[in-house]
Amino acid sequence: MGTVNKPVVGVLMGFGIITGTLRITNPVRASVLRYDDFHTDEDKLDTNSVYEPYYHSDHAESSWVNRGESSRKAYDHNSPYIWPRNDYDGFLENAHEHHGVYNQGRGIDSGERLMQPTQMSAQEDLGDDTGIHVIPTLNGDDRHKIVNVDQRQYGDVFKGDLNPKPQGQRLIEVSVEENHPFTLRAPIQRIYGVRYTETWSFLPSLTCTGDAAPAIQHICLKHTTCFQDVVVDVDCAENTKEDQLAEISYRFQGKKEADQPWIVVNTSTLFDELELDPPEIEPGVLKVLRTEKQYLGVYIWNMRGSDGTSTYATFLVTWKGDEKTRNPTPAVTPQPRGAEFHMWNYHSHVFSVGDTFSLAMHLQYKIHEAPFDLLLEWLYVPIDPTCQPMRLYSTCLYHPNAPQCLSHMNSGCTFTSPHLAQRVASTVYQNCEHADNYTAYCLGISHMEPSFGLILHDGGTTLKFVDTPESLSGLYVFVVYFNGHVEAVAYTVVSTVDHFVNAIEERGFPPTAGQPPATTKPKEITPVNPGTSPLLRYAAWTGGLAAVVLLCLVIFLICTAKRMRVKAYRVDKSPYNQSMYYAGLPVDDFEDSESTDTEEEFGNAIGGSHGGSSYTVYIDKTR
């Protein structure tokens, strides 16, 4: 939509977004891209046609949560909404609808933010002045829709699985002409006998003109994940709101639409106030018979079934020819904001009682904003040798006050909320101006819990254990907070060989008392640090060498015994006239006849033995 010289707002409808700094690159009207491989397609579709968005089921495992600092309200576990809560304690539920609005730059309400709990990396929050905010959704209240697209919880509805999952799609930009009709057709993949509820909502763009008009743009989160989405200028979003046009409910009984009796409930008075006819609604279809400028904007279709399936589609309706008449402006790429943190560490450390060693988190960072506040915190929970494995629910670090994190099953074998863990050490860098090397030029204040008896090194990223007792065995979790928000999480299991426990990281929230425990097998095998114990390393080398020597000795003895058996058989059991030996003919008994020197010499010369009538001579024929 041309240059971005002021903040913009975007409707996020993509799946599987990795957290990080929000950037809008090449913000010009571009062709619609397929989310999975970003193949380009036609920008516009013909007027008076029926449009069917492309949907794709392969997406990443992540979920978005909208939340704000409005008044606290009771949380309904059966509702597809999440009620805003302050102190960053909004949490994710298995809801099946999704809608939100991006606002980069000047905020509508600095308390309302968009964040992603299911990734270990940065949350989407850029501070009070440059935060990512949301506006009220659907019926104008402060409830914010969410979606859970964890592939382990849903199957593929298009393949007929019993546990379908929400489906991705590509955005559709529809060009219409004044006084002409247009039809929007959403993708419908239904299962026989399931009751479906469809909702059409509408964000008008009547007050949005020029560069403030909604447009499909290329959006990047961090430097690795980019996608197409609808972007609306912040000034436009302040002057308009989203309306829920209608809701339709029916039970799918067959392939023919005529067999599906449905009920349409018009929940918006927008078009009545404008003295215009509301759009006609059918299952998966929205029709406008005569297009006026009041019908232009963003249409969002959501469908959820009684079996837990959920899907959606987004349409951007604009005047035909707008992109040709709009003055082209050069693309502007905003400077990156926030920070990026990456860590490398071992997930386990085996020690012997009395050892002295260091537990290091190798932290690599790239900070784009200054001044900033940085908190490095070490947390600890003891391990139970009967737990195989220990489970770390990283989502609870982003939502420490969520009920699922504070009250869950099998608490002795899990790490959830930081409120339930012990704080070992922390280092704080406040109002730091040096983004390149904060450890050298910024004042860091460290605090150690004396009960652990550990030493903090390397600016707060390394714990030193001295004369380590068995009681310090446990799961140590390292958390990086940037400007008050969780940016990175890492963990290490410290234990002896006798009480070693594996640990894995889980996505999502832990099961509560009313939910069955997870049945999936661990996907990750925790590596053991090969250099953690000299005694263990020496024993491994010695055992391996002894095994090799023993194997060689066994092979040698087997080969030798086999050769001896074969040789003895050939000498003792060789048949007559073999190639190597043959039996001599019998001669007269020398004791019964007169002996002569000549006969004795002959017998001694040929190596024979005499003493009977069956005198036998063995002669080597090869000589």
UniProtKB/Swiss-Prot annotation:
Region (Fc-binding), start-end ranges: 352-499
Annotated GO CC locations: host cell endosome membrane; host cell Golgi membrane; host cell junction; membrane; viral envelope; virion membrane
Protein topology in the membrane: Single-pass type I membrane protein; Single-pass membrane protein
Keywords, alphabetical: Disulfide bond, Glycoprotein, Host cell junction, Host cell membrane, Host endosome, Host Golgi apparatus, Host membrane, Host-virus interaction, Membrane, Phosphoprotein, Signal, Sulfation, Transmembrane, Transmembrane helix, Viral attachment to host cell, Viral attachment to host entry receptor, Viral envelope protein, Viral immunoevasion, Virion, Virus entry into host cell
Motif (Internalization motif) on chain: 582-585
Subunit text: Interacts (via N-terminus) with host receptor IDE (via N-terminus). Interacts with gI; this interaction enhances the Fc receptor function of gE. The heterodimer gE/gI interacts with the Fc part of host IgG.
Role of this protein: Envelope glycoprotein that binds to the potential host cell entry receptor IDE.
Name listed for the protein in its UniProt record: Envelope glycoprotein E
Organism: Varicella-zoster virus (strain Dumas)
